[in-house]
Amino acid sequence: METSASSSQPQDNSQVHRETEDVDYGETDFHKQDGKAGLFSQEQYERNKSSSSSSSSSSSSSSSSSSSSSESNDEDQQPRATGKHRRSLGAGYPHGNGSPGPGHGEPDVLKDELQLYGDAPGEVVPSGESGLRRRGSDPASGEVEASQLRRLNIKKDDEFFHFVLLCFAIGALLVCYHYYADWFMSLGVGLLTFASLETVGIYFGLVYRIHSVLQGFIPLFQKFRLTGFRKTD
């Protein structure tokens, strides 16, 4: 009995020792797994941090590159604007001393501004004193007509011209009444005479001829006036 009891005690002790070893081994495995999990989480955190820092650095570099490109574009535009301004100033002041030369400067600019259209054959351009004329028409005829109008001071609605035509109509009326003794027929002849003379005078240049003839008699009237009012001793 004693031998069996003694043999059973070592077996129990060895079993307890094995159980304690198993528990210790399990605890060490659990600590190892915890350590591995902690290391993995720390490595993942460091990776996330490095990726976020790299993305922020790339965004900052892109923003800095865009700002530098915009600044370079502004600098390119500013010299172009200054060059255009200098060219415009140089067109008005071609000489080096800053004073406009003869025949240059503002007249050229105004001439360019007065150019209304392109080089089409029917464009409207300024033509000096005769106003706007059509390019392609004869400039000599327009200038001659303008000079005649300035010299004679004639308009198509000139009161003197209408008065002369009215005198012709009244004369025709009186002659017709003298021959026919009928006022109705005389008024008709007078109105027809007045209308026909108005039409011919306005549309066929009779007004210019009448004025030229009358102005030919003006020097004679002035001579008679001077001789008539001359003082005698």
Curated annotation (Swiss-Prot):
Bilayer topology annotation: Multi-pass membrane protein
Chain positions found as Phosphoserine: S137
Modified residues (N-acetylmethionine): M1
Low complexity bias: start-end ranges: 50-70
One Pfam family cited in the UniProt record for this chain: TMEM40
One of the record's GO cellular component terms: membrane
Biased composition (Polar residues): 1-14
UniProt feature, compositional bias: Basic and acidic residues: 105-114
Intracellular or extracellular location(s): Membrane
Compositional bias of kind Gly residues: 93-104
Keywords attached to this entry: Acetylation, Membrane, Phosphoprotein, Transmembrane, Transmembrane helix
Keyword Acetylation: yes
Positions of region (Disordered): 1-143
Segments passing through the bilayer: 160-180, 187-207
Domain of life of the source: Eukaryota
Name of protein: Transmembrane protein 40
Organism: Homo sapiens (Human)
Gene name per UniProt: TMEM40
